């Protein structure tokens, strides 16, 4: 498996990563837990070292599955997870207040069976919390050893610049595929300028190659 360096803070990951959301959330019924664990471990055996989850997937269930699956190889893999929602409240509204980040990271660490998170993304930008406060909180968590690297997801160019000025951003995660190429206009050039890595989600168009669309499909 080829390796890639994300950003310039020393994070190296496999060229192919496994997004684990669909095992618990978003695309039909959840995969049976032991089958999901077996799939994740099969990916490890094939050289995948980069695994993506989030507290909102389930909510919480996906982190549990990923944590159990990767516990035997924790020191050999990179785990990315995300914060930014009130997952245990109706409506699951955005919440990136510093005190909330500090509270929810403890739950993620417990579910993932680890004492640190390799890459901690703000899942979505919270318009009610200045991103400088978010970045400052993550910088503190990095200093405490609970987080290794800071990431953003679906953030604008301005937001990326502001966050990066407070705490170096290692990676941005955004949708990118043959069917959605918006990041090419402004985001990818900015990431190259700032030496920030890019992690695409839904690179196969959210199931485009699974038979959902065929020659009989009309638009």
Model-predicted regions and their roles:
Residues 1-78:
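N-terminal binding-site loop/beta-alpha segment at the start of enzyme catalytic domains
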Residues 3, 40, 63, 67, ...:
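Generic structural signal for well-ordered alpha-helices
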Residues 6, 18, 36, 51, ...:
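Conserved, mostly hydrophobic/aromatic
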Residues 11-16, 46-50, 73-77, 113-118, ...:
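Short, well-ordered coil/turn segments that N-cap beta-strands
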Residues 22-34, 87-102, 123-128:
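Active-site mouth loops of central-metabolism enzymes
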Residues 30-43, 96-113, 156-162:
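Short, acidic/polar
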Residues 88-121, 175, 179:
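Active-site gating/metal-coordination segments in enzymes
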Residues 125, 129-219:
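Beta/alpha (TIM)-barrel catalytic core signal, keyed to glycine-rich beta->alpha loops juxtaposed to Asp/Glu
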């Amino acid at each position: 498996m080829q390796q890639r360096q994300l950003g310039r803070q020393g994070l190296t990951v496999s060229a192919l990563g496994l997004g684990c959301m669909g095992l618990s959330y978003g695309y039909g019924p959840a995969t049976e837990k032991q089958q999901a664990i077996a799939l994740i471990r099969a990916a490890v055996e094939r050289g995948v070292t980069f695994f993506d989850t989030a507290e909102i997937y389930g909510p919480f269930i996906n982190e549990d599955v990923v944590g159990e699956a990767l516990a035997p190889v924790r020191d050999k893999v990179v785990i990315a997870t995300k914060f930014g929602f009130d997952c245990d409240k109706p409506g699951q509204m955005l919440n990136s207040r510093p005190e909330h980040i500090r509270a929810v990271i403890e739950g993620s660490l417990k579910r993932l069976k680890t004492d640190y998170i390799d890459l901690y993304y703000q899942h979505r930008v919270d318009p009610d919390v200045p991103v400088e406060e978010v970045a400052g909180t993550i910088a503190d968590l990095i200093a405490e050893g609970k987080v290794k690297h800071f990431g953003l997801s679906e953030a604008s160019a301005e937001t990326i610049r502001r966050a990066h000025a407070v705490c170096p951003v290692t990676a941005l995660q955004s949708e990118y595929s043959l069917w959605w190429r918006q990041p090419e206009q402004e985001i990818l050039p900015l990431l190259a300028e700032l030496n920030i890595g890019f992690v695409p989600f839904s690179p196969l168009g959210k199931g485009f190659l699974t038979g959902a669309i065929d020659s009989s499909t009309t638009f």
